[in-house]
């Protein structure tokens, strides 16, 4: 059984080294759509794989952190990086080039960590993020699958510190330790209470 939730964010970037000069040489933006697919081996007490409302919490917070921000590769020139940091309140510094494929791998990596560190209380089954799709436009998307995180090439692109968020982004988190919890060694960080009204 698989469920899907759609998230959206708007952002600007530059994709270096690609064949399209418009993308490789200019700051430009996209209205991104991120589809997150979660797989389970059984349904919970509400006959749900996972309540969609629960996917509007930590996962939503993480994806919203990329919204209305400039994303830049840490291989950009120091001058360019300083300009962004001095003139943008919201920015995300990334250790990977900013293709849709890289975003798909990155979101899969961090959303998997969030789900693994989440404690649910409604008799949920074994949950996993089976894939993530990232649409830059209506015409195409990149999709990353859980098995990709075992591929040495793909695995080398994403790690705990492959993104860092500006203070302007962090200031809107309800929990100032939100990102630290995602990448920490703690196994249980995000707790979700049992629904109040239960029919046996």
UniProtKB/Swiss-Prot annotation:
EC class (word): lyase
Molecular function GO terms recorded: 6-carboxytetrahydropterin synthase activity; metal ion binding
Residues at which Zn(2+) binds: 13, 28, 30
Protein's UniProt keywords contain Ion transport: no
Reactions it catalyzes: 7,8-dihydroneopterin 3'-triphosphate + H2O = 6-carboxy-5,6,7,8-tetrahydropterin + triphosphate + acetaldehyde + 2 H(+)
GO BP terms in the entry: queuosine biosynthetic process
Miscellaneous comment text of the record: The active site is at the interface between 2 subunits. The proton acceptor Cys is on one subunit, and the charge relay system is on the other subunit.
Protein's name in the database: 6-carboxy-5,6,7,8-tetrahydropterin synthase
Gene: queD
